[in-house]
UniProtKB/Swiss-Prot annotation:
EC number(s) on file: 6.1.1.15
Name of the protein in its database record: Proline--tRNA ligase
Record-linked InterPro entries: aa-tRNA-synt_IIb, aa-tRNA-synth_II, aa-tRNA-synth_II/BPL/LPL, Anticodon-bd, Anticodon-bd_dom_sf, Pro-tRNA-ligase_IIa, Pro-tRNA-synth_IIa_bac-type, Pro-tRNA-Synthase_IIa_type1
Any one Gene Ontology cellular component term annotated for this protein: cytosol
Subunit description: Homodimer.
Pfam families per UniProt: HGTP_anticodon, tRNA-synt_2b, tRNA_edit
Organism: Streptococcus pyogenes serotype M3 (strain ATCC BAA-595 / MGAS315)
Family to which the UniProt record says this protein belongs: Belongs to the class-II aminoacyl-tRNA synthetase family. ProS type 1 subfamily.
GO molecular function, one term: catalytic activity, acting on a protein
Length: 618
């Protein structure tokens, strides 16, 4: 492919509105352009990368018997009313009317559509299982689109749906998809973890997220690629190294979620779902009597603890939530933080929000800072974190402004439902007892759910089972964020390329180091002087030879300065660069491996053979 024929609008500078390196490089390297807020055009390079990823997906899904189809993006609102999500999905749902004033939506996901199609076509367990998927654009009216392709209003997604006559059959397909996803993301060159996830708006129970890890850019050996003009990091002056470190640190780590993972086992979970090893403790101290103490001007846990000279771990944090219009009291050990996802899931609530100060005062008789679990109205629902039951003689609010109660003992002074509702902390023991929890940032690239009968129940999707009984179809759901894969790969494979000029100056610039499977082309073939006919002829021969061996070749045939060509090549990020330069008449070309910065000169006749050796090594 001739570069002069492609739309690759590279920029000299990083875009000023970009906060994450993937967004900056996609724009600067000419992969994407924003059309309006949260809406992007995928230019030829991005489209080629996305198509390569689609090919990987299709190959892996064929292995597990998944069949591709295409559903409409424009959906009738009636289907979403059937499932109940038209009202509950929230403001992210694009709603519109046609000329007949009928309600429609732009699909953010397609559970209802696929359920309806199968409901109307499948009547017997003998017609199951079915394993269907599609790849198409989705729409969500994001309040604040940001970070390039990571949070957009239109995005490309692969969503799959499986249909079964029982849960045992679903379990088999779920495991097939889990393995297929691992194969897909491995082939795509991603550093990822499969983690325990939350079903969220999908309505699933068991689920697993696949997170592309976005580590801090502190490891120079990983993030910096040295040109052949620099032997090692030790040769770079200290002041230049400090500049390089500052440039690496200047770009925000783009991971949208925090994950907790074990240092010694396979345990990993989204922070919203992560738990830790818990061991109930026996009470050894005698229980004190309750005593009300004045705590003037103490509104926070740390202020109360300091005033009473107790540790924060001996205090009870009392919170009030409204769950589906019903008040729920939540209790935590004072230095812990509430995990609202865990609480919402435990309550099986559709809506959960913190109560207002007015609501708290009406319920407790006091304002924030003085709330506690003692002497609440009969029938009050109290959900306490499991650590609370280990407390003896704790401090809690007295439900009287400016006062607290000491000597509070769970079981004696209040009754509660005990469950894990806290956020885990880094360094705590993994729940499986192996290793401690560490945190990392990550980008969600895939998610699989066991939906069960959530949609078949609400939409009447039933079959006759082997005993002739009418039963709901059991479903699974499997998504991959196709367009955000591009962002995730660039976040992990962006590199700072450093070289030394003939005058001894050090220069560095960002570029992409695409893994071979997703690079838009395999080889960047550059002619230094397009007016040199010998070089032109050699370039044409090499292009034909490479293509005959199955290489995708981008040939830079532009009449541009060589420095501009090399800068664009570093930005675009193809794995191999072959330069036809001053030694073209001698039949000598230069090969450069992008990942390492290594370069060698070879006879053009030996190019293919040399590339085969080099690509095996790297």
């Amino acid at each position: 492919m001739k570069q002069s024929k492609l739309l690759i609008p590279t920029l000299r500078e990083m875009p000023s509105d970009a906060q994450v390196i993937s967004h900056a490089l996609m724009v600067r390297a000419g992969y994407v352009r924003q059309v309006s807020a949260g809406i992007y055009a995928y230019l030829p390079l991005a489209n080629r990368t996305i198509e390569k990823f689609k090919t990987i997906m299709r190959e892996e899904f064929e292995k597990i018997g998944a069949v591709e189809m295409l559903a409409p993006a424009l959906l009738t609102a009636d289907l979403w009313r059937e499932s109940g999500r038209y009202e509950t999905y929230g403001e992210d749902l694009y709603k519109l009317k046609n000329r007949d004033n009928s309600d429609f939506i732009l699909g953010p996901t397609h559970e209802e559509t696929f359920t309806t199609l199968v409901r109307n076509a499948v009547k017997s367990y003998k017609q199951l299982p079915l394993n269907l998927y599609q790849i198409q654009s989705k729409y969500r009216d994001e309040k604040r689109p940001r970070n390039g392709l990571l949070r957009t209003r239109e995005f490309i997604m692969k969503d799959g749906y499986s249909f079964h006559h029982n849960y045992e059959d679903l379990d088999v397909t779920y495991e097939d998809y889990r393995q297929a996803y691992e194969a897909i993301f491995t082939r795509a060159g991603l550093d990822f973890k499969g983690i325990i996830g939350d079903g969220g708006a999908m309505g699933g129970k068991d689920s697993q997220e696949f997170m592309a890890i976005t580590p801090a850019r502190t490891d120079l050996d990983r993030w910096v690629v040295l040109d052949k003009s620099i032997a090692s990091m030790d040769d770079i002056p200290k002041e230049v190294l400090e500049e390089i470190k500052a440039e690496l640190a200047a770009w925000m780590i783009s991971g949208e979620d925090t994950i907790a993972y074990s240092t010694k086992s396979s345990y990993a979970a989204n922070l919203e779902m992560a738990t830790n090893e818990y061991k109930p403790s026996s009470k050894v101290a005698a229980e004190d009597a309750l005593a009300e103490v004045e705590t003037p001007h103490c509104k926070t846990i740390d202020e109360v603890a300091a005033f009473l000279s107790v540790d924060e771990t001996q205090t009870i944090k009392t919170l009030l939530f409204v769950a589906d219009n019903e008040p729920v009291v939540a209790l935590l050990v004072g230095n812990d933080h509430i995990n609202t996802v865990k609480l919402k899931n435990y309550l099986a609530a559709d809506f959960l929000e913190p109560a207002s100060e007015e609501e708290a005062r009406a319920f407790f008789g006091a304002g924030f800072g003085s709330l506690g679990p003692v002497n609440l109205a009969q029938g009050s629902r109290i959900v306490a974190d499991r650590k609370v039951q280990n407390l003896t003689n704790a401090v809690a609010g007295a439900n009287k402004d400016g006062f607290h109660v000491t000597g509070v003992n769970p079981g004696r002074d209040f009754q509660a439902e005990y469950v894990d509702i806290r956020e885990v902390k880094e360094g705590e023991m993994s729940p499986d007892g192996h290793g401690v929890l560490q945190f990392a940032r990550g980008i969600e690239v895939g998610h699989i759910f066991k939906l069960g009968t959530r949609y078949s129940d609400s939409m009447g999707a039933t079959i006759l089972d082997e005993n002739g009984r009418t039963v709901p179809i059991v479903m699974g759901c499997y998504g991959i964020g196709v367009s955000r894969i591009l962002s995730a790969v660039i976040e992990q494979h962006a590199r700072l390329f450093v070289n030394k000029t003939p005058k001894g100056d050090y220069r560095y610039a960002w570029g992409i180091n695409f893994p071979k499977e997703l690079a838009p082309f395999d080889v960047h073939l550059i002619t230094v002087n397009v007016k040199d006919q010998v070089a032109q002829d050699l370039t044409a021969k090499l292009e034909a030879d490479l293509m005959a061996k199955g290489y995708d070749v981008l040939t830079d045939d532009r009449n541009e300065r060589v420095g501009s060509k090399f800068s664009d090549s570093d930005l675009i990020g193809l794995p191999i660069r072959v330069t036809v330069g001053k030694k073209a008449a001698e039949g000598i070309v230069e090969i450069k491996i992008k990942a390492t910065g290594d370069s060698i000169e070879v006879n053009a006749e030996n190019l293919i053979e040399t590339l085969e050796i080099l690509t095996k090594e790297h």
